[in-house]
Amino acid sequence: MREIMNKELLKKVIELKSNGLTIGEIAEELNVSMETARYLVLNAEKLLKEEEKAIKLENVDIFIDWKNIGSSANRLKYISSIIVDILKSRNIEFDTVVGVSTSGVPIATLVASELGKELTIYIPKKHISEEGKKITGSISQNFSAVNYKRAVIIDDVVTSGSTLKECIKQLKEVCSPKLVVVLIDKSGLDEIEGVPLIPLIRIGAVNVEQK
């Protein structure tokens, strides 16, 4: 497989790295997996300097840029209204909306507000520290607790599902996760840790042989 590397993406990686962001934070910012973010951080400067247009990758990842939605509170409100409609159509009973930090938080906030539900924030371990230490994600103490509650989880993009898997495992220790809703799904998963996954948009790669 061959992956076309966008020069603007490479420049963005270099900028984020120079600003002191960790690999986990860069993965979150670009909506790519930790493996892809690590590869980009290690190779972006070389790729940009040599102006390579294509590199071979064992696995293809897709760069998602949804800032035209995220930069507007009004547009985010439209997205949250779609999620609210989905939740109502499924007749799911729940007590709190869990927003996965960072990008899932604004959407979760709007959904919780529209439905009159509590708001919980989950901070993944990739935002707490880098590799090498045994750490877990955490539930922010500044927002609603989840103990013994029914929860709907909201995130922006699911790539491999590892962050949501981590989140669900931790939540299951104290509450009952009912559903995961994401803006964009790149994983192709229908459920994570037994919890149904509902995407607004699902992205898949198709290999087309050139003749």
UniProtKB/Swiss-Prot annotation:
Gene3D superfamilies assigned: 3.40.50.2020
Protein keywords: DNA-binding, Transcription, Transcription regulation
GO BP of this protein: pyrimidine nucleobase biosynthetic process; regulation of gene expression; UMP biosynthetic process
InterPro entries for the chain: GfcR-like, PRibTrfase_dom, PRTase-like, RNA_pol_sigma_r3/r4-like
A Pfam short name: Pribosyltran
Gene Ontology MF terms in the entry: DNA binding; orotate phosphoribosyltransferase activity
Domain of life: Archaea
Domain-related comment: Contains an N-terminal DNA-binding winged helix-turn-helix domain and a C-terminal regulatory domain (or effector binding domain) resembling phosphoribosyltransferase (PRT) domain.
Membership in a protein family: Belongs to the purine/pyrimidine phosphoribosyltransferase family. GfcR subfamily.
Name this protein carries in UniProt: Transcriptional regulator GfcR
Species name: Methanocaldococcus jannaschii (strain ATCC 43067 / DSM 2661 / JAL-1 / JCM 10045 / NBRC 100440)
Lineage start: Archaea, Methanobacteriati, Methanobacteriota, Methanomada group, Methanococci
